[in-house]
Amino acid sequence: HKQAHWLRQAVYGLAEWYPHEIAEAQLVAVPGCYPTASLMALLPLKKAGLLKSSKVIINAVSGVTGAGRKASLATQGAELSLQAYGLFEHRHTPEITQQLQHEVLFTPHLAQFPRGILATLYAELNDDTSDDDLTGAYQCYAEQPLVRFKKLARPAIKDVVQQPFVDIGWHRQGNQLIVLSAIDNLLKGAASQAIQCINLQLGLPVEEGLL
């Protein structure tokens, strides 16, 4: 790392989770797009102690802007369909694992639409976990203006494109849980999240300039 001396001073810029640390930081590291979609969905469960120790599986689909701006034959409309990439080695896997403090199996996919991410996350719950426990875990977002959570919701990319929101919903069968999370990879997954961090540092409402 070319600037290793900064690593210990950098604060992780997931605005809903580290507002006080961000407000006081000299350096904020804005999360990646896939980690944002994944962590916003999973952190409430982890913090509430509802997850078994088994590995969480994350399958996430991103629009072609997730591959960057560089011209590439593989990302041209006639070539691109839906494909997995970065199997077992995507750079966002250690970021998710470090922040969640839980082992994950993450597989990203690139699809033929411009922008947005839909993450589908599969987890095993502790045997005594109730629906009220799940709903209660996500109450941590009750006062967060840029998080839209609804039990049994099926978030869709069309509802978050060009918006600064993350949409989250969950479904369960016994102790098997599926959580769905949708963001705009260029906004909540990048630019608008950076603005949230700037707002926190300036003492402004986190949604200032975004709603």
For the regions a language model picked out, list residue spans one by one.
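C-terminal helical cap and adjacent loop that interface with cofactors, partners, or active-site loops
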Residues: 22, 158-211
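C-terminal substrate-binding/catalytic lobe of Rossmann-fold NAD(P)-dependent oxidoreductases
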Residues: 55-59, 64-183
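N-terminal Rossmann-like NAD(P) cofactor-binding subdomain of oxidoreductases
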Residues: 1-78, 82-85, 171-173, 208-210
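Short, well-ordered alpha-helices that flank and scaffold nucleotide-derived cofactor binding pockets
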Residues: 43-47, 98, 196, 200
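PAPS/PAP-binding and catalytic site of the sulfotransferase fold
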Residues: 28, 133-137, 194
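Conserved active-site and cofactor/substrate-binding residues in soluble primary-metabolism enzymes
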Residues: 9, 33-40, 87-95, 133, ...
